[in-house]
A protein has these predicted regions:
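N-terminal membrane-targeting/pre-transmembrane regions
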Residues: 1-52, 129, 157, 175-185
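Short, ordered beta-strand-loop transition motifs
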Residues: 2, 79-81, 132-133
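Non-transmembrane, membrane-adjacent beta-strand/coil modules in membrane-associated proteins
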Residues: 5, 12, 87-153, 177-185
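Short N-terminal helix-initiation segments at or just after the protein's N-terminus
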Residues: 19-24, 45-51, 78-92, 147
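Short, charge-rich amphipathic segments
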Residues: 22-42, 54-60, 92-102, 167-171
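Loop-to-helix transition at the N-terminal end of transmembrane alpha-helices
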Residues: 47-66
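Conserved beta-hairpin
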Residues: 62-106
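C-terminal/domain-terminus segments
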Residues: 150-174
Length: 185
């Protein structure tokens, strides 16, 4: 990302750093490779209801090659400048939020499965989340009432950069999300 303004905060998170996602992705890929090679090398269709070789090649391209490459390239980049918050879920899309659109900033601990149904780009209950892993982030409340949660490995630094961009004092450290009851209750 090229910035014309000084960068107050920048973080890059990659799905390839989440071991269980990579085990799943490469397990699916390995199965596709095995099916294709078994059918091509033996010259006989694999299984009781085999797919034609052309269909197997298509599946191999999509899941044996495409899926691993996609997950190796997939990353969440967050950049805060004095004027904007840039959220890039590469290679899918980029979202830019101007600082004057932001009404509030709150670092929090959230439940990605319970509140959003998982990780990635998720919309749930009038909120949208951009996250890769973990349960820490910063929620932006926009002037139109929409809420945007940005997952972060360093929510305090992200919140401080957002506050600095808006000319406000840094918010307190991450608090539990309202959807997660405090421990001990």
């Amino acid at each position: 990302m090229k910035a014309t303004h000084p960068v107050l905060f920048r973080e890059v998170q990659r799905f390839r750093d989440v071991w269980w996602v990579m085990v799943l992705v490469f397990g699916i890929a390995a199965l596709q490779w095995w099916l294709l090679l078994a059918q091509l090398l033996s010259g006989r269709p694999v299984g009781d209801n085999p797919a034609p070789t052309a269909i197997l090649l298509l599946y191999w391209l999509l899941f044996g090659v495409g899926l691993p490459v996609f997950f190796l390239l997939l990353r969440l980049e967050v950049e805060v400048t004095p004027n904007t918050v840039l959220i890039r879920y590469a290679p899918l899309f980029t979202r830019q939020i101007a600082k004057n659109e932001i009404a509030g900033v709150e670092p929090l601990t959230y439940g990605p499965l319970r509140e959003f149904g998982g990780w990635g780009i998720r919309g749930w209950g009038g909120r949208v989340a951009y996250n890769v892993r973990g349960n820490q982030g910063v929620e932006l409340t926009l002037r139109d009432g929409r809420r945007v949660l940005i997952g972060s490995n360093d929510p305090a630094a992200l919140a401080a950069a957002l506050a600095a961009a808006r000319g406000e004092p840094a918010p307190a450290t991450a608090a539990p999300s309202p959807a997660i009851p405090p421990s001990g209750s």
